[in-house]
């Protein structure tokens, strides 16, 4: 018996040569395709309103793109750090379970892929299979396109959907069509995809075979959960818990014993642009010449993650006896907050708002922390973070979990600053030696002669209990940080600056990141949990400029990059 024809071609008959020889389509204006996990069939439904054309955001002028690196990924020359290695970069859970090689998707076909499409055309979609995942980018091979290389899409773009989503949006198929890329002209498209009075030519045999295989695999758990991409985009775009123009207390990075009042002026996901403005400053703002990156001036931006150690809620400084530079009105307001006799202003960032999500630490455990305890510190205020230093707890704050700490390099309190015990910078005694990180020597100590045991005995001090500091990430996650894997990294001093970068070394939970185009002397240490490490594609999603790698002046490609 003749093998039944493809389920993608309804009511057609096939001769022994495999060609369609007659069609018995019943044409109705409102008939449409409905996709289940097993087959396609028609149902009647009233037409729906036109689906709005999804137009990509205009690309920022001068921004770097990952196109060359993505092409190199096919040849195995470039490997990307996976999204799941960077926990918390976006509020997306188990993303890798929904986007991995072999998954089937529904993809919007844009004019760059099909020149026959215009802004007045119906939205064209076709089916594809994920072949690779690189950061926030996925490579998708279109069904039936044997001679076309996979195309790259941003996994959070408006170009990829779960199977069947188009039919739910436009059941009558009036403003949306499904069409293979190889069939550019309308009359080349099989009648199954474009109904008309003229019979369509047969689908080429290779394409038909792939469509059969594609359909057969739909019930093999190779399709994403319904509406998963809409849910992921919703999570990525969900409103921040902060609002524009809210005021927050900000650690002065030039004088870390001082707190200033700042305003939230921009919000991109977890990243906030916070600036000290004239309305909250008790005197004239420091001039541009002062090179204070936190003060509002033209072309000056200070960006931090919403969990940054720079940020504190209104009233924090007053409660903990920290020096505050602010107007008399603010000082009086925060004093009432600290005393419990006043209420927050609607623009105040409160303790509950800023510290939402911070782990609760029991009083019993907090009692293990003592003034004078020592530890190893990746100094977040250092100009270049390439080593650890010896540091000490100077004070226990009234706000539970907060400490005043400082490096032992100076006996002065001028370098001390407040920080929560749950942070990325404090490490247990012996961490640097165990994982091969340079520990800055103290004054009077010969190179390579520093020993923790002798130092603690000399200072009559004890080390901070290891259980008070963050544990190592899982071995599985640490192994994701392989040498050479690329990502986007925020400059830890120039916080408005995000650059393409790669993993250079791994030391326990600490990674040395090299900025593309920069010498290794500018590489910096980051914690694996740092929110300053971002997957490739973060800047594109949030429409933030990704800096070009620095190129030598004599480099022929220097006109496309930035000069050293």
From Swiss-Prot:
Q: Which residues cross the membrane?
A: none
State the oligomer form and interacting partners. Interacts with histone H3 that is trimethylated at 'Lys-9' (H3K9me3).
Q: Name one GO cellular component term.
A: nucleus
Describe where the MBT repeats fall, as residue ranges on this chain: 64-176, 205-327, 331-442, 450-549
Pfam families per the UniProt record, alphabetical: MBT
What's a GO biological-process term for it?
negative regulation of DNA-templated transcription
Q: Mind telling me which InterPro entries this protein's record contains?
A: Mbt, PcG_chromatin_remod_factors
Q: What SUPFAM superfamilies does the database record attribute to this sequence?
A: Tudor/PWWP/MBT (SSF63748)
Q: What happens when the gene is disrupted?
A: No visible phenotype.
Name the gene behind this protein: mbtr-1
The organism's place on the tree of life at top rank: Eukaryota
Q: Signal sequence span per UniProt?
A: none
State the name under which the record lists this protein: Malignant brain tumor repeat protein 1
Look up and give the organism this protein is from: Caenorhabditis elegans
Coiled-coil residue spans: none
